[in-house]
């Protein structure tokens, strides 16, 4: 049998053996772990150099063989220990009681040994520690008078300790019987098992006020406990709240409590010996600041000791009787006194006046206006010689002559004692005017006439001679009462002595024709006057409507430049292009018409004029069709129509149309270089709209023909935009001649009137026609007079817009309304210009919403800046800028809020299309098909109304913000 290290361990302690075994086991594990780490690092062959071939044959490495050896040694040692003959050691109680090791951080301190007699310690849980419950029977019961400690914040002021008091007689009896006071209290606590119910459980929050229980202290001769005030409820406190708490009284005592006001009276029917004890029986609250007096009286009263009910909110009911405790004769209410009602307080009746029906009617307050107090005015018939002294002293007039109240007419006549004051009640309405001191005084008798009044006032007479007359010796003092008429004479509507003051009217200036001029028409027959008047009316109406030429006034430099370029084109065959820029009404079209008419008279060469308008020719195809139509009329041929119908491109079609007008040398017709073909002058009105055409094909071909030697043409563009030349494409701009003529509007009122004279004047070739001469003189007379209505009308248009076309519209109706019986202009015809039929566009403008009106103002602002067309995007951007500037101005002026809001883009787009549907704005390209939101926003529109129509609509608009006027005035 092989020797083992565990064979001679019989005398050793088993615990030491197990400890040594555990230490060796831990040491071996540590060493083997380090060896395994060394083997993994590559030192297996050095530590096991003599590895057998069997291991190699089995496919095991040196490290794996070493691990097998360690496992075999460990298994062998365990088998030896388990098969030893030694008795197994008894397990240690420390190991048996030790709880299994859990995962986590190792224990810092080993567990303490547990005593055999002690109870196992329960593991402490999180949260509030549990209360320790003691099971010892020696624990005494808690004091029932001590409240239970509750949760929450500790009480700020501890409750007072209640000590029951014992009467003196009871104490002496207890002492004689050998009982002391603590035993009595202990017996009292044992006899009252439910005494703890007096102290409610202490709850969370604010400490509860303790309320006494009924009948808890009325026995055993104990005095009542100290009573704390009741818990203060929420809301408004009651109107009359007694702050004194009274304990229940014994049944044998008759107690009456009278609660009147703020005092508390207690009446008790007690013996004198018990008065002191009864007064001590009621204890006051020590915490109350104000204590009420307790008055004890011996007078017995018949009442009960009811506690007053808590007063409810609101007005007390009317049908509920008033409860009085301890009533007496002094507090009795008069039953005859009427019930107090709502409204104005009742007028008190004097004490000395008897209460009868007459006095009640006298002092009863009625509804409505109070009655008029009787006036001290005395009729004239009551005055005699003996009353003259009384008139000088107002104090001598006693009130006994006048009525106390205002009776009706029948009572007034039946009262014989008040004949001296026959006055009627004051009527409603405006009081009569104060009569003058020196005014004539009429007699109240119906028999007196106006003549007698004048005679009596002029010559004084005695009373006997004229009893019905007025005494002239009446005093002129201010204290003299005014006289009134009696009930028999109706009052006059207006006194004769009152004079109506009327301010004189200003003489209206009227301009009548000169009588010398009128005498001329007397010698002329009616038929001749009618024919001459018809000629004058047709000539001036054609000028006002733009159908005939108007003579140009001023602009001499502009006329010289344009005439020179026209002459070079017609005579020398040069091609040029020029743009005339200026605001509306400045005379651009008049300048072109004047130069063309002058060239037609002075130049013998043949030329043609083609007029195009960007408002009507919205695309190049329509413009080409209009050119072909006008040239075919001028040339009287059909080649233009055939060329238009052929399938050719735009440039070839335009070249073929102008082929007949090309240079003769190019066509091979003539060999003379000085010979030229007929010139063509293109007048393009609204030139900026042609610039907006796609690719600008029309302008490119016209400028290209003008720069080349194909045909002598002159392109004259009329526009209101000063930046129109900058909008040209690069290829079009390179072929433009860059010649611009600016035009300015009339700069003075005299120049404005001079232009109007040139329109209203009718030319007389020989000066032999007297009717035309009188017409021109009448025009000069009306325009030169500053008081005439025609001159005022011209001033209005000059300072408002300086637009002659608007003035022409106002002059058209008075001129066409002339007749042969009145062949000259009348100034009254121009005074009723404001009474003409209102424009329907003004009605449309004043019925617009605020958003629609704002967008229309933005479109008009663009037109005032010489931008006749705009789209929705530009109008909405202008609207946003105006709104932001208004908000900034309002904030700078100290306003808290702005009066209008900024509308969104979608809502504004609908409002913009509404303006187009009602005709206030019209599209520039009506023939194009608009589709999609982007096309709707980018489509060009131009306003159909001018700034004057919008300003009139703003004045008639209701509830319009002030900044809308400012937006419009910024461009005027």
From Swiss-Prot:
ATP binds at residues 541-548, 582-589. The modification Phosphothreonine is found at residue 405. GO terms for molecular function: ATP binding; ATP hydrolysis activity; DNA replication origin binding; protein-macromolecule adaptor activity. Its main location: nucleus. Residues 31-59, 82-172, 193-223, 310-374, 408-477 are annotated as: Disordered. Residues 147-156 have a biased composition (Basic residues). Gene3D superfamilies: P-loop containing nucleotide triphosphate hydrolases (3.40.50.300). ORC is composed of six subunits. ORC interacts with cdc18, recruiting it to the ars1 origin of replication. PANTHER family: ORIGIN RECOGNITION COMPLEX SUBUNIT 4 (PTHR12087:SF0). This is Origin recognition complex subunit 4. The gene is orc4.
